[in-house]
UniProtKB/Swiss-Prot annotation:
Protein name: Nucleoid-associated protein MAE_23910
Coiled-coil segments on the chain, per record: none
NCBIfam families linked: DNA_YbaB_EbfC
Record-level Gene Ontology MF annotations: DNA binding
Family: Belongs to the YbaB/EbfC family.
Subunit structure comment from the entry: Homodimer.
Disulfide bonds: none
The protein's role, per its UniProt record: Binds to DNA and alters its conformation. May be involved in regulation of gene expression, nucleoid organization and DNA protection.
HAMAP family assigned: DNA_YbaB_EbfC (MF_00274)
Length: 114
């Protein structure tokens, strides 16, 4: 080891480490706010025939379902298929919303490596 070089963990690296910890705290605080926001969302998913709408939170928790009475006169397989289709659409929309919100939260972190 050359004289005066120490372990390579000088003041510059300490400052980077402090910045990284500060950013991590900001993300943690933002994550708490985001969690509440996702819990309070109501994201719809509609079947292709438009007769069923399912609502999920941003955390994919079921919130409600609306079924057009006209669907109930259909064959059971059509009813079940419409419900499943609406659930899948709502789930996809909810997970995409969560992914997008997480990207917003963590964008620009640029945490340095040590």
């Amino acid at each position: 080891m050359a004289q005066g070089q120490g372990f390579g963990f000088g003041l510059g690296k300490i400052k980077e480490l402090q910045d990284a910890f500060q950013k991590a705290q900001q993300v943690q605080q933002g994550a708490k706010v985001l969690q509440e926001e996702l819990e309070n969302m109501e994201i719809p998913g509609q079947s292709e025939n438009g007769l069923v709408t399912v609502y999920l939170s941003g955390n994919q928790e079921p919130r409600g379902i609306e079924i057009d009475p006209a669907l109930l006169s259909q064959d059971l397989e059509i009813v079940a298929g419409s419900i499943l289709e609406a659930m899948k659409v709502a789930y996809d929309a909810s997970t995409e919303t969560m992914r997008s919100k997480m990207e917003e939260l963590t964008s620009g972190l640029n945490i340095p490596s040590m």
